[in-house]
Amino acid sequence: MFFTKVLNNQVANGLKQLPVHKRVQMAYDLHIPNKTVNPNLNIRSHEPIVFVHGIFGSKKNYRHDCQKIANVTHTPVYTIDLRNHGQSMHALPFDYETLAQDVTDFCEDHGLKKVNLIGYSLGAKICMLTMLQNPDLVRSGVIIDNSPIEQPHIEIFLTQFIKSMLHVLNSTKIRADDKDWKSKANQAMRRYIPNGGIRDYLLANLINKVPKGYKSPVINYDDGYIHFQNPVRHMTEVAVKNVSAWPTEHVKGLKFEGQVRFLKGTKSAFIDEKGLEAIKEYFPNYSLSELNATHFILNERPQEYVKLICDFIKVNRYKSLQEHIRHVENFSSAELEARHNAEHERQMEELRQLTQTTPTAEQVKTIDNLASKVDLSATERQQQQNKEITV
């Protein structure tokens, strides 16, 4: 097993072993639609958005973009920290099967259904694998500049990322109390990464104090030096070989029939002809938009990619509503009324019972869920009467 070899190499290099956990608790932020956008907005959503970052990224990288997406689409957006990133646990394995299962576990733990997945780079592959292996969990996907194939040609770039970060940690020995710690780290990384935008992306993980919340068991935050939030010394192999991989054998014959929008940088090689053929095979209902950018689309074309995502989510929601109404219209008026009346009354009676006394935290969740169902029931009846949709 590859990660067993990784653990042995960590010991050989004098490093404390990275723990092995099948499941991890992932840190996340929830971006709620701003009430000023629509004061009457009911934020309960059966189709929330989950945003998955790239290698050495975190949930904080695109928090402003995700808030815009939440506001424009009137949809809650969950941004997560993958294992070994941000404020989430540091642990092996670090492969696509494990990372996709982490996303699935997160959705199930938080009661998220029919999610819209948005993934960038590493996160894009994780989202694609999640869609293929758990299609009932996902409504749609936005895949930002990646394709479902092995990509050995990107290993040279991943290696440079690792070298630059290790150079900051091992060679420069920058003190945490140095007032110029970040600029010195930036200068040190130039040796391996001339692109200032990429350096800024990696430096967003650099800290000069003990982090709040999760504290890695393999990083000594009290040694007086700066540190990356990622366990960089422990990721020299997995961040290169595993990130460039794709579990072809595990997804053979699988397809995701939902709508998937791919965003491609015209100056990027992450979606080539081979990648496009694989996209067609796995995702028959895909569409492709190109932006004048390198692989770092989110930094170079922030307004364009946010608009493309919002338009896609809104159009897809309209199609979802159309499907729902076509389903409802298959019932006769009498059948529909009987169905609604019985279910509506049962839900209302349960709500009455729960709200007679001060509810517990668990009962609050039940009340919220029931209220959402009652709202939907009323909406269905109105739709049957009006025979029209307002989006």
UniProtKB/Swiss-Prot annotation:
It is found in: Mitochondrion. Residues 1-24 form a transit peptide. Keywords: Coiled coil, Hydrolase, Mitochondrion, Transferase, Transit peptide. InterPro entries: AB_hydrolase_1, AB_hydrolase_fold. It comes from the Eukaryota. The keyword Mitochondrion applies. Its EC number is 2.3.1.268, 3.1.2.1, 3.1.1.-. SUPFAM superfamilies: alpha/beta-Hydrolases. It catalyses: ethanol + acetyl-CoA = ethyl acetate + CoA; acetyl-CoA + H2O = acetate + CoA + H(+); ethyl acetate + H2O = ethanol + acetate + H(+). In contrast to S.cerevisiae, W.anomalous is a better ethyl acetate producing yeast. Ethyl acetate is an important industrial compound, used as a chemical solvent applied in the synthesis of biodiesels, paints, adhesives, herbicides and resins. It is also popular because it is relatively non-toxic and fully biodegradable. However, the sustainability of the ethyl acetate industry is severely hampered by the current energy intensive production processes that are based exclusively on petrochemical resources. It holds the Pfam family Abhydrolase_1. GO terms for cellular component: mitochondrion. Residues 48-154 form the AB hydrolase-1 domain. By ethanol. Thioesterase and esterase reactions are highly repressed in the presence of high ethanol concentrations. PANTHER family: PROTEIN ABHD11. Alcohol acetyltransferase that catalyzes the synthesis of ethyl acetate from ethanol and acetyl-CoA. Can also function as a thioesterase by hydrolyzing acetyl-CoA in the absence of ethanol, as well as esterase hydrolyzing ethyl acetate. Belongs to the AB hydrolase superfamily. This is Ethanol acetyltransferase 1. It comes from Wickerhamomyces anomalus (strain ATCC 58044 / CBS 1984 / NCYC 433 / NRRL Y-366-8) (Yeast).
